[in-house]
Amino acid sequence: MSFNSLKIGKYVIEKPIVQGGMGVGISWDQLAGNVSKEGGLGVISAVGTGYYKNKEYSKKLVSDRPLSEANFYSPEGFDAIIQSAKAIAGDKPLAANILYAINDYGRVVRDACESGIDIIITGAGLPTNMPEFTEGYPDVALVPIVSSAKALKIICKRWKKRYDRVPDAVVVEGPKSGGHQGFTYEQCKLEENQLENIVGPVVEEAALWGDIPVIAAGGVWDKSDIEDMMSRGARGVQMGTRFIGTYECDAHANLKKVLLDAKKEDIQLMSSPVGYPAQGVRTALTEMVEKREGPAIKCISNCVAPCNRGEEAKVVGFCIADRLSDAYEGNLETGLFFSGTNGYRLNEIITVQELLTKLTEGE
């Protein structure tokens, strides 16, 4: 089957493939700009923008790390990434992924709007007040990520009552995605929570609120997966991990190699200071953390609200900002490498254009 374009708000995405937001520094200007340029929707991760271009946009560093959320989520770094991605994408739409759990969420959303982003995607919590922060930017399309029809219903109810609007699209994410999950450990394993079983109910709920396109995410790997999701009522898919296997992906070569070398059994769920389990690759770091021998936790960047200034990091045994940033810098000893459950299937590095051709025309 050939795929129809995907409409999100006023924006038309020629190929209904959204590249998932991946931070720190995995989906920044090069990856997002090129995905949009080639007809998909490129998504810039807002996480850790203070690390962009060797931390040149961080106004204050402590132990060579951006101090506090003001520098970790650097507005100047974020703006530089967005402008660079726009220069690559031309007049094609571009999105930003901004986690609801971060400190300074509202400010970072405003930063994205002021920098001219077209679409904002938000997961890691229920963004019930998201429209509040985009006031004055009516053209910015808003896309929450949910893991159930119930979550979508709560968001739509709240948005309709408070802001007289509903989401422009919704991403429904199953537990095979990389990074943070919308489920507990136990829930991730349940059959009823697998993507193929949650897409249908979310499509039904979305239809009750108008014409809200549903984008399926979490474990989507190839054209047949996309066709399967479309047959269940999705109008697009979101994919993260597979885009790591592209030349344009902003990730360090070492990060790409970790995935290229990973075996199926290396990819696992782990605890995270964000309060949700996260999916990633077993490495030297995960083994150190299990023995409670991980790197010192200093909470320099104060990145996410649920961590409570390092308290949760001490419970789980690592600082997520520092460890994801180490992965961005290619540190194989102390880096944290997120991946979806299919990450072990990555076996080559190709161009974004080649990948989108494989996804839309088959391999």
Where are these regions (language model features)?
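Conserved active-site-proximal phosphate/metal-binding subdomains
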Residues: 18, 177-215, 221-363
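Short, surface-exposed recognition loops or helix-turn segments adjacent to catalytic cores
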Residues: 130, 216-217
